[in-house]
């Protein structure tokens, strides 16, 4: 249900704003989006896993907060991010 360290490193490299960037909203949203999509696939075969569903809802809420922050800081970067990730908004 979690993402591999290689996948996480790839996302950090792809969405980083500068070398060694691990904490920018873009990187955090990309990692959360990957984890959310992994959990969504998990729920297709484990419909009654409510414990993990709670974790999914918390991840979605955290991503929403980070996206709101990114939008408030720089609308252009926000639009680019949701386009690159394919997030509906």
Swiss-Prot record:
GO terms for cellular component: cytosolic small ribosomal subunit. GO terms for molecular function: rRNA binding; structural constituent of ribosome. The keyword RNA-binding applies. GO terms for biological process: translation. The keyword Isomerase does not apply. Keywords: Ribonucleoprotein, Ribosomal protein, RNA-binding, rRNA-binding. InterPro entries: Ribosomal_uS15, Ribosomal_uS15_bac-type, uS15_NS1_RNA-bd_sf. It comes from the Bacteria. Part of the 30S ribosomal subunit. Forms a bridge to the 50S subunit in the 70S ribosome, contacting the 23S rRNA. Belongs to the universal ribosomal protein uS15 family. NCBIfam families: S15_bact (TIGR00952). One of the primary rRNA binding proteins, it binds directly to 16S rRNA where it helps nucleate assembly of the platform of the 30S subunit by binding and bridging several RNA helices of the 16S rRNA. Forms an intersubunit bridge (bridge B4) with the 23S rRNA of the 50S subunit in the ribosome. This is Small ribosomal subunit protein uS15. It comes from Jannaschia sp. (strain CCS1). The lineage of its organism: Bacteria, Pseudomonadati, Pseudomonadota, Alphaproteobacteria, Rhodobacterales.
